[in-house]
């Protein structure tokens, strides 16, 4: 069985070379990583009531929710998991999470590394977030379960921080990038989306060309294509290839951050693992003829996060 999970940045040759340099000590000890995905609403992150959209008004509710999957936490983890996982995962990679071939996923921290301090995924998250705008320009209410801005501080067992900033609001400053800071230098590994990825290292704290100590030496290939090339090569040549655990671990990091923002609480790794289910009735889902795992209120709205009020689950 060969399993790819769609984290295409992990297949970037430029990022891979940079991750190796960082693990060799090129910027000293890693102390901080920053990731940003801030732009206007995209895909199905914003939804108005089903009955207000002619193309959806006659669909079964479950089918509509799947069509608008970014709007529902049960269906996708919301825009947080679907959008931000790539930036967050590539930062964890630079820290050393799941280095090497796809079979080396990271696993349990004590079993694999022997010491919790060397666990290269975050163990805690605290976050803020909210929904600034509750209606579109036509005055129609948004009924999705997403916030339109998130700020998350992840903490590693050794004290390293990963800061992530996400926003889906029109008219604001846009940034789509990831950076890493060490005791001896600074690095950039995405600057304007997931590709191209101008991976480079510098002395100091800024990407000053005069202080550049390394950059990816080859012509960069497209990681969206590379992930397929790698999977198909494994299939054709029967190479070990299973990204499932690594993808699950990256998803769990996202779950921690999203839950921290939606509940207003600090969330530890085990808290996220043992949290109340996102959709208590999901196991009863039998198809498009059954009830949706989350049901609309009379006005078409859905249960939404209430930080500080709903503390033990997200909605």
PLM features: what roles do these ranges have?
Residues 139-140, 159, 210, 300:
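Intrinsic-disorder/low-complexity loop/linker signature
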Residues 1-3, 160, 238-240:
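Short, surface-exposed connector motifs at secondary-structure boundaries
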Residues 1-143, 170-172, 177-179, 186, ...:
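Predominantly a Rossmann-like dinucleotide-binding segment in NAD(P)-dependent oxidoreductases
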Residues 3-6, 163, 243-244:
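Short catalytic-loop micro-motif centered on adjacent basic/acidic residues
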Residues 131, 151-154:
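Active-site Gly/Thr loop motif
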Residues 157-161, 184-185:
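Glycine-centered tight beta-turn/hairpin loop motif at sheet-sheet or coil-to-beta transitions
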Residues 137, 159-169:
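Flexible, glycine/threonine-enriched loop-and-boundary segments that flank and lead into catalytic domains
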Residues 58, 62-63, 76-113, 120, ...:
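C-terminal helical cap and adjacent loop that interface with cofactors, partners, or active-site loops
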């Amino acid at each position: 069985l060969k399993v790819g999970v769609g984290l295409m940045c992990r297949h970037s040759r430029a990022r891979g070379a940079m991750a190796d340099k960082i693990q060799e000590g090129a910027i000293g000890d890693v102390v901080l990583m920053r990731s940003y995905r801030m732009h206007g609403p995209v895909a199905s992150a914003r939804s108005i009531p089903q009955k207000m959209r002619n193309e959806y008004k006659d669909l079964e509710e479950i089918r509509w929710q799947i069509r608008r999957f970014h709007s529902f936490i049960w269906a996708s983890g919301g825009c947080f998991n679907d959008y931000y996982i790539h930036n967050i995962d590539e930062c964890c990679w630079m820290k050393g999470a799941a280095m090497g071939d796809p079979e080396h996923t990271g696993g349990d921290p004590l079993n694999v590394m022997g010491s919790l301090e060397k666990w290269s995924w975050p163990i805690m998250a605290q976050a803020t977030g909210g929904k600034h705008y509750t209606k579109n320009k036509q005055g129609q209410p948004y009924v999705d379960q997403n916030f339109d801005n998130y700020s998350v501080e992840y903490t590693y067992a050794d004290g390293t921080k990963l800061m992530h900033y996400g926003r889906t609001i029109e008219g604001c400053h846009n940034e789509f990038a990831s950076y890493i800071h060490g005791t001896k230098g600074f690095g950039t590994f995405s600057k304007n989306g997931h590709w191209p990825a101008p991976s480079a290292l510098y002395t100091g704290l800024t990407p000053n060309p005069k202080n550049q100590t390394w950059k990816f030496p080859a012509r960069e290939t497209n990681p969206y294509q590379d992930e397929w090339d790698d999977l198909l090569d494994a299939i054709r040549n029967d190479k070990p290839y299973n990204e499932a655990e690594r993808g699950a671990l990256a998803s769990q990091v996202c779950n921690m951050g999203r839950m921290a923002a939606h509940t207003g609480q600090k969330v530890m790794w085990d808290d996220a693992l043992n949290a109340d289910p996102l959709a208590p009735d999901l196991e009863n889902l039998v198809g498009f003829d059954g009830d949706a795992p989350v049901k609309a209120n009379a006005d078409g709205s859905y249960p939404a996060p209430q930080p500080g009020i709903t503390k033990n689950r997200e909605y």
